[in-house]
Structure formats: structure tokens, C-alpha cells
Amino acid sequence: LGKEGYFAFNDGMTPENSCQCSACRRQYNPALPFEKQASGWAFRFVARYAEAIRAIWPDRRLATLAYQHYQAPPEGMRIPDNVDVTYVTKIVHYASDPDLFNQELEKVHAWSKLLNNKTERFGIWLNIVDPATYTSKVPFMYPNIFKRWLLATRDVTDSCFINGLNSRLNRSGEEGRLNAFSTYPMVWLQSRLLWNPEYSVDELLWDYIRNSFGPAADTMRRFHDLIISRWEGIPWSPETMDEIAFIHCVRYDEERVRELK
């Protein structure tokens, strides 16, 4: 066997789908922000599991996720030093608002501190499936946000993973697979920036467009510039409007749709 075991709660484990036994319910705190409601409960179990592993296999490590209502670091407890954590965020690509960007950074730095600032113990997973999977087929691109994120976090982690959409993923159905193609330009940019976050976004984008579209490159550059500016330059506030309405009434109003056409 390898030197690291993996444990994660079910991907769909939201508060209503978590264990409802009396012992577990006592450990939930629904009065806290969503990402903190079950952190103590989840990581107390992870800590016990890690110590049990250490007692039998002293050189083994336990890898786990910080996600959903246990995304924030637990307060007032120690994480065993044989535990590695991957922080899962679904909102970095929405972080054109500096406040939202900084809130995510604060959680990342809190986790790093709890793991004794060991970059090899801390990973970041950008879970980017919205809006293309569930909300809207409108293309979205966020290369400048992504670059800022990589530069801001490269001293606290030595790994960053991004899941996206796969045109061959059968569980998504035909419509879901077609949605995947609209994300490919951003997937390409992400791949290049992961290798070197110092790259110029403008130069990378032009390289992609020139090699992909040939004689239509100038037109497609204007198209992609508009997509980027409408995503990165207009923050969405969930408190004021649902995302579908925001995308189709604000981000892409009638004037912008005519411009894209």
C-alpha cells in the first residue's frame, strides 16, 4: 500500500444530508456561517481517524477535504501532523469583488496556519462547475482573477487542482457535454498559468486565439475580450438578484448580445 490514505465525506453532504443522530446533531452549529457549521464535527472525526492510523502505521498519512459546511478550519482544536488537507472552493472564479476574493484568502491562510504553514500538507481545489453545468450556457472567462489567485496563494500551498467539464463525461448527458466546449479557452489559459502564474494573460490569450482561429483571430479576440470584461468587471451579488437573471439581464443585456452576434 502507499503511504497516504484518503478520506472524504460524500460530495453531496450538506447539512440536511448529514448524520442526524443526537450525538452528531449536538456538534453542528447552524447559527454560524455555512462553511463553519460542521467544521468541528468533521475534523474531530478526522483527527481520531488519523491518530488511529498512526497507532498502527506510524509512517502513514491521511488526506482529506475541507468542503461544504466543514470548509472553514475548526476553531480551538489541533489537526494531527499526519493529516493533509485540500481546501475546496466553488467561488474563486466569482471573486471579481475584492471583498469576496479576500474572504477566500482569509480562509486559506487560516488553514495554512493550522497546518503549521507546511505547504506540502495543504492543497487547493477550485471546483468550477457553475454556471455552465447548472445555470447558463453563456461563456465565462476569468483569467485575471485566476492569475491573482495563484500569485496570492503560491506561498501557502504547493498544489492546485481544478476540475471542470469533460465533453466525454456521460453522466452529464448530451447537453452537459456540449456545455463543456465553451469552457475550453479558459481551461487552456488555466493550464498555462498553473505552469507559470507570471505569464501575461494578454499574451497567452492572443497565442490561443491566433493559433485556434487563424484569419478570424482579430474578431475572436474582440469576442473573448468582451466575455472576460463582462465576467470580471461586473461582480454578482447573490443577495440582490439570482444568477440566471443577472447573467441574462445585466451581464449580457440586449446591447451586449447584439455586440456578441
Regions found by a protein language model. Name each.
Residues 192-237:
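Charged, amphipathic alpha-helical linkers/stalks
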Residues 75, 174-175, 230-234, 242:
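Charge-rich, low-complexity amphipathic helices
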Residues 235-261:
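Histidine-centered catalytic/metal-binding microenvironments
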Residues 4-10, 220-225, 237-243:
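Short coil/turn segments at secondary-structure boundaries
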Residues 1-205, 212, 249-258:
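Catalytic-core regions of glycoside hydrolase
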